[in-house]
């Protein structure tokens, strides 16, 4: 019995010790976990700042340590691109470090190395996949896959297609300027930016499907703000939050249909419209009907998928179409809005343009000939200056440094590093463009203009340049020619503050461009 009691006592003490130990550990566990986490973060950030291959490149230490630096500027401060320009000046360096594995180049001479044809600097897959537009031309990063994709849709974006669509462009411009002139007679201002968006969206729809969306003639166009545009504005407003926090894409995709319809009115209707057009194309192909006029986007995709045996994914096609619509509508209307603002603030340039357009009236008003319009020298200079100053690509277009790395400004940048160069580095460079912030179309005329051609980078350069370049040029020339030959106008409640550029991956402006029509020259 004594032995039993002794054993029990020892066992009890052990049990008490175990309980005490567990209790002590349970109290200390949060502290241990916190300490471990802090040590991990300290090690991680110290390594990134001081021992990373990019540690010798100037730049904010916070940017080197965490992506929160760029997230802050992109989400809350209208874009990291503006900050990049300031950082190059602050550090007096042609290269700055903007992220844990990311650098930005501020020397224009390297632009054609990074973005030229045949370059080994390819799109960074880690960036473009976060845009959430699966299978669109924007997010394809593999050069061979991109080449194959362009071979499928290339005919849609040819110069011949742009030529064929010119009469439709003229008709849309006639109807839209008539609407603006009517508003002028009623004493109402026109939100010309929205009108440009409607025209551009209808033209992109013509290009893709041989028929317009009908935005110009829509009943919703009383104030030229279609529900589709409202949806796009809301969608682009959360581009950066979705980019840095991809779980938001999952959350948005999980919303019930009625919530999506409330948040993005117009997009659901657009999906249904495109689904109907897709079903028509599939039925026509199944019945062996010949393609009328020219092949549409759906025709080309159906044929390509059936050749390879791949399934046709309507959701992927819709994402691709939406990318084309938004890019074509936003970029074109954005440049035209800037152009209108610049011209109405530059009486001398406006007078020169209007004089040239008056002489060209026979092939603008009477028998529209866009090829002759695009040959007008001063109009060409105006278009190029609008493209330069509007900064159509405010963001970074990230690429990956090839194996072996590259030396820039005395710094070695190893292969695998994300590298980029914002367009303002070139377009607002004082050595290339003296008085870079001033609207001076004359800089593009004569021999000087020829020398500047290599720096006309609004549509980027190389194999990944804008696929819609031909259509965009046609729309820009035609719009400025028709609007400024027909309408006398002045800015209405639009200031420089409204033209402040915000980088939402695609550029937008702070406000809207409004004009007041004072005369319709074609009704005199």
Curated annotation (Swiss-Prot):
Any one biological process term the GO annotation gives: small molecule biosynthetic process
Cellular component, GO annotation? membrane
Superkingdom field: Eukaryota
| Enzyme Commission (EC) number | 1.-.-.-
Q: Name where it's found.
A: Membrane
Which family, according to UniProt?
Belongs to the cytochrome P450 family.
Recorded protein name is: Cytochrome P450 monooxygenase ankB
Species name for this entry?
Answer: Aspergillus thermomutatus (Neosartorya pseudofischeri)
